[in-house]
Amino acid sequence: MIIELPVKLYQNLVNHAQKEFPKECCGLVVGLINDDKLEVKEIFPMTNLDDSAEHFSMDPKEQFEVVKEVRELGYEMIGNYHSHPFTPSRPSNEDKELAYDEEAIYFILSLQKSVPVLKAFRIKKQQDVSEIKIRFIKNGEE
């Protein structure tokens, strides 16, 4: 499996994380799901109700509005994203404990170094973590 992510959406995600720094940012990732690839079509920044550099909790009202919009667009929920302002882009113990949806993709953007690093994971049984390759797409091409 591979994730295709337009560079423009990646930059939107980075901008969201930098705007919220030093707090964690969070949001939803939607698109088209095929057998061998996930095509990201849109990201939806959410409010982090925890207002924290170490935790995030999405606003349920905002989530509900996004779910309605996603249905109207004909897309599917791929997963969610959040930033790690001071740590690497890998799931923390808390991230794993809160990963209840085994089909969701968890995108984590690290701002720990000068160049942001985005990685994507699937988490099974709240402990088995597997990284999924992200292919960045520019103007419809790799």
Regions found by a protein language model. Give the residues of each.
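Conserved beta-strand-loop surface patch within small alpha/beta domains used
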Residues: 1-77, 86-142
